[in-house]
Regions:
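Generic structural signal for residues in well-ordered beta-strands
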Residues: 43-47
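Feature activates predominantly on carbohydrate-active enzymes
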Residues: 23, 31, 37, 48-52, ...
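Sec-dependent N-terminal signal peptides
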Residues: 4-14
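Boundary at the C-terminal end of the N-terminal hydrophobic targeting segment
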Residues: 18-22
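Short, flexible, solvent-exposed loop/turn segments with mixed acidic/basic and small polar residues
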Residues: 12, 54-61
Length: 167
């Protein structure tokens, strides 16, 4: 039940900006550590303002650390994924990750700034939720939530309570 509540809270609030308390940064540092164990200390995460109401992220470097900026946790996680793909030539997927990273991560060649298209980025379907996700344990749910955040998803299908309407 505890994990169910955590998943519900994450899904409900993942698209909302969090300012001040460091909650978004902590969540993304934890995500980085899960995806690339031992590398989180090579990143610096910073919150920035949205651009004209749209989610935005930046990838930069300061010569020592990789700087990821975003207006919420999903934007920061998306910046992390962009950095892995286009600077490290690494890949994170459902079917196995390609993460052969050097001990010292490379600096981005240039500062990259991206606006994430669409206010709501939808993901999942009833088959996934009904036939597959029902068998997931907490680690598998955490992997899926990380994957969603890294791919800018802020509106996953969440059908809890729908059976109450149907029946």
């Amino acid at each position: 039940m505890k994990n169910f509540c955590l998943i519900t809270l994450f899904i409900c609030f993942s698209g909302l900006p969090v300012w001040g308390g460091g909650t978004s940064e902590k969540a993304v540092y934890d995500l980085i550590e899960r995806v690339t164990p031992g590398y989180a200390s090579q990143y610096r995460l910073e919150m920035i303002q949205p651009e004209n109401g749209s989610d935005v992220y930046e990838v930069d470097g300061d010569g020592q650390r990789i700087i990821l900026r975003g207006n919420n946790a999903v934007s920061l996680a998306t910046a992390f994924n962009w950095y892995l793909k286009y600077t490290c030539h690494a890949h994170v997927s459902w079917f196995g990750n390609q993460l052969k990273l050097p001990a010292k991560l490379p600096q981005p060649a240039n500062k990259e700034r991206r606006i994430i298209n669409g206010k709501y980025r939808v993901y999942m379907n009833y088959c996934t939720v009904s036939y597959t996700a029902a068998w997931w344990n907490w680690e598998r749910w955490q992997q899926e939530l990380d994957y969603m955040a890294m791919n800018a998803i802020n509106m996953p299908l969440f059908s809890v309570g729908l059976d109450g309407v149907w029946y």
